[in-house]
Amino acid sequence: MSDINATRLPIWGIGCNPCVGDEVTALLTRGEA
């Protein structure tokens, strides 16, 4: 998950909100998978 978050966060510009970034990453992962 660390690698995914590190890749997702900068793209969405949610580096200042790790908690939100984690939720967004989970939603994206579920949507793609």
UniProtKB/Swiss-Prot annotation:
Cross-link (2'-cysteinyl-6'-hydroxytryptophan sulfoxide (Trp-Cys)), chain numbering:
12-16
Cross-link type Cyclopeptide (Ile-Pro), placed at 11-18
Q: Name one GO molecular function term.
A: toxin activity
Alphabetical UniProt keywords = Hydroxylation, Thioether bond, Toxin
Give a short account of its post-translational modification. Answer: Processed by the macrocyclase-peptidase enzyme POPB to yield a toxic cyclic decapeptide. POPB first removes 10 residues from the N-terminus. Conformational trapping of the remaining peptide forces the enzyme to release this intermediate rather than proceed to macrocyclization. The enzyme rebinds the remaining peptide in a different conformation and catalyzes macrocyclization of the N-terminal 8 residues.
Q: Which residues carry this modification: (3R,4R)-4,5-dihydroxyisoleucine?
A: 11
Q: Is the Nuclease keyword given for this protein?
A: no
Positions where 4-hydroxyproline occurs in the chain: 18
* Disulfide feature: none
InterPro entries, per database record? Amanitin/phalloidin (IPR027582)
* Protein's UniProt keywords contain Ribonucleoprotein: no
Propeptide, chain numbering: 1-10, 19-33
Residues modified as (3R,4S)-4-hydroxyisoleucine: 11
Q: What does this protein do?
A: Major toxin belonging to the bicyclic octapeptides amatoxins that acts by binding non-competitively to RNA polymerase II and greatly slowing the elongation of transcripts from target promoters.
Question: What is the similarity comment for this entry?
Answer: Belongs to the MSDIN fungal toxin family.
Name listed for the protein in its UniProt record: Alpha-amanitin proprotein
